[in-house]
A protein has these predicted regions:
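N-terminal disorder-to-order initiation segments that are Gly/Lys/Arg-biased
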Residues: 1-37, 112-113, 118
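Helix-rich interaction surfaces within compact, conserved domain-sized segments
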Residues: 24-25, 88-118
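Short, structured beta-strand/loop micro-motifs enriched in basic residues and often containing a Trp
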Residues: 33-45, 91-100
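Short, conserved secondary-structure segments in the cores of folded domains
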Residues: 46, 52, 72, 102-104
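Short, well-ordered loop/turn sites that connect or cap secondary structure elements
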Residues: 48-51, 56-57, 108
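Conserved "cap/hinge" positions at secondary-structure junctions
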Residues: 59-60, 118
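Short, conserved beta-turn/loop elements at beta-strand boundaries and strand-helix junctions
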Residues: 61-62, 68-74
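Short, solvent-exposed secondary-structure boundary/capping segments
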Residues: 72-83
Length: 118
């Protein structure tokens, strides 16, 4: 299981609702990206969780991970960085991306858990 807690929601982080994208970063997010990011504390990390078929839980929302880019687990491990797309999986998957279904943009709040588990 991978577990994090949402600590801060950048003032522009939810501006990507129409594109159905959430950007997560650890507390060390670069200042120019912090305002666009969901800042979270990664409490538990398991690289094996980053695979198609795993569950992604954000607060009360439950998703199935459909595809994972080759750098997503590494980015999460080192930077707390994760980009989640609630869209159809494209032909070319971005290296740091996770694609989740259903394709519904979640409402997020400070203090909520984010879980990834097989």
């Amino acid at each position: 299981m991978t577990k994090s807690i949402i600590r801060e929601i950048g003032p522009l982080a939810l501006n990507f609702q129409d594109d159905k994208v959430l950007i997560f970063f650890g507390d060390n997010a670069p200042s120019e990206l912090r305002e666009y990011s969901i800042i979270h504390d990664v409490e538990v990390f398991n690289q094996n969780d980053f695979s198609a078929g795993a569950k992604l839980v954000i607060g009360k929302y439950v998703y199935e991970i459909e595809a994972v880019g080759g750098e997503a687990a590494n980015n999460m491990s080192k930077l707390g960085h994760l980009v989640v797309y609630f869209t159809e999986v494209p032909d070319e998957i971005l290296p740091g991306a996770v694609y989740a279904a259903p394709h519904i943009f979640p409402i997020v709040s400070n203090g909520e858990e984010v879980l990834i588990t097989l």
